[in-house]
Curated annotation (Swiss-Prot):
The chain crosses the membrane at residues 58-78. It is a single-pass membrane protein. CDD domains: ATP-synt_Fo_b (cd06503). It is found in: Cell inner membrane. The keyword Disulfide bond does not apply. GO terms for molecular function: proton-transporting ATP synthase activity, rotational mechanism. It comes from Rhizobium johnstonii (strain DSM 114642 / LMG 32736 / 3841) (Rhizobium leguminosarum bv. viciae). This is ATP synthase subunit b 2. F(1)F(0) ATP synthase produces ATP from ADP in the presence of a proton or sodium gradient. F-type ATPases consist of two structural domains, F(1) containing the extramembraneous catalytic core and F(0) containing the membrane proton channel, linked together by a central stalk and a peripheral stalk. During catalysis, ATP synthesis in the catalytic domain of F(1) is coupled via a rotary mechanism of the central stalk subunits to proton translocation. Component of the F(0) channel, it forms part of the peripheral stalk, linking F(1) to F(0). The b'-subunit is a diverged and duplicated form of b found in plants and photosynthetic bacteria. Belongs to the ATPase B chain family.
Amino acid sequence: MFFVTPAYAEEAPAAATGTDAHAAPAAGEVHTETGVAEGGHARGPFPPFDSTTYASQLLWLVITFGVFYLLMQKVIAPRIGAILDQRHTRLSQDVEEAGRLKAEADAAVRTYEGELAAARAKSNAIGSAARDAAKAKAEQDRRAVEATLSEKIKAAEVRIGEIKAKAFADVGAIAEETAAAVIDQLIGGTVAKADVAAAVAAAKKEV
């Protein structure tokens, strides 16, 4: 930014006047030179480096910085602060929501695990009761079958004893008759029936 001071403003017309004096020759004069006069542009230092303009430059610098500072303080900084506060509030809400959802998920997991453990315990109890009932029923059926078989075995043993006794009785009579016939054929005589019965009885005892 360039600043025009009164000193530079006074020098500018003088330079312009000097230029006009060179540009407008008197009547009747003929100039054959084609060079450009630069004396007017060489007067004075470059405005930003002119020591006479330092005060005004510092003043405008302070004014510009003050305006920029007020703009930052009144407009930009509040907007940035509001955005940061909004983001902080949003993050806090998101963190709270995440914590709430995590707590609900943990509670749901604990409830599920509790229900699963209860279901397993109930299933084990039902299985154990079913096994015990089946075992008791099987034991009862086994005992009933054993009792029935025992009764049948006893009845069969009695029947076998009766058949055996009858068979032995019949065998004894047949043996006596057969022995009498054999003796009669061998020695050609008869033997007393009591002797034959005694011999058969002795043979039965040996068997």
